[in-house]
């Protein structure tokens, strides 16, 4: 008998637990779910809902789930960044799905925002530096609070912006700051 899908909801739960995810954790998820194969539910909404449900089930009510919602395509444009409406750019369908959840919060950064849900999501994403990776940034809060990076279907060199935070803090000679001016619309 040929199976018509590669994995199930139970497989998602088992896999997340196998890599060490557990209750009350805060996690930062970068993903390309297309790399995982065919899911038992054939709809895009079913796939996204179940991955988010699995993550929520594992981290529980005291955990937090964060995703990248960067919109780097706004750099050097006249487009206005809107906290609620501006979509992420090339960050994956799970990121966009989480961004659109009613209970999600997004950091106010026009180019490198992060979105999250959970008991402390607002704390992590509010009152951050205007420099995307410097002291006072989301990344500093992630480091200070042991947020776990989870890469799904993405090579680590494309999925760990935390490295840029470390490079900025340490002051490596090959990084430099480049300022961009961007109009920001709705901030609520």
Show the residue positions of the predicted features.
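N-terminal and secondary-structure boundary signal
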Residues: 1-188
């Amino acid at each position: 008998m040929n199976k018509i899908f590669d994995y199930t909801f139970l497989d998602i739960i088992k896999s997340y637990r196998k890599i060490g995810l557990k209750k009350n954790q805060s996690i930062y998820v970068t993903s390309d779910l297309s790399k995982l194969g065919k899911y038992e539910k054939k709809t895009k909404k079913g796939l996204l809902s179940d991955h988010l449900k699995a993550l929520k089930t594992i981290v529980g009510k005291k955990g937090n789930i964060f995703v990248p919602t960067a919109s780097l395509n706004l750099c050097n444009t006249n487009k206005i960044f809107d906290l609620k409406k501006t979509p992420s750019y090339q960050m994956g369908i799970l990121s966009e799905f989480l961004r659109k959840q009613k209970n999600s919060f997004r950091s106010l950064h026009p180019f490198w925002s992060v979105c999250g849900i959970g008991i402390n999501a607002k704390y992590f994403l509010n009152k951050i530096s205007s420099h995307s990776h410097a002291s006072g940034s989301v990344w500093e809060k992630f480091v200070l609070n042991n947020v776990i990076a989870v890469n799904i279907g993405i090579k680590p060199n494309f999925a760990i912006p935390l490295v840029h935070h470390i490079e900025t803090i340490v002051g490596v000679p090959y990084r430099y700051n480049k300022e961009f001016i961007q109009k920001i619309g709705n901030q609520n």
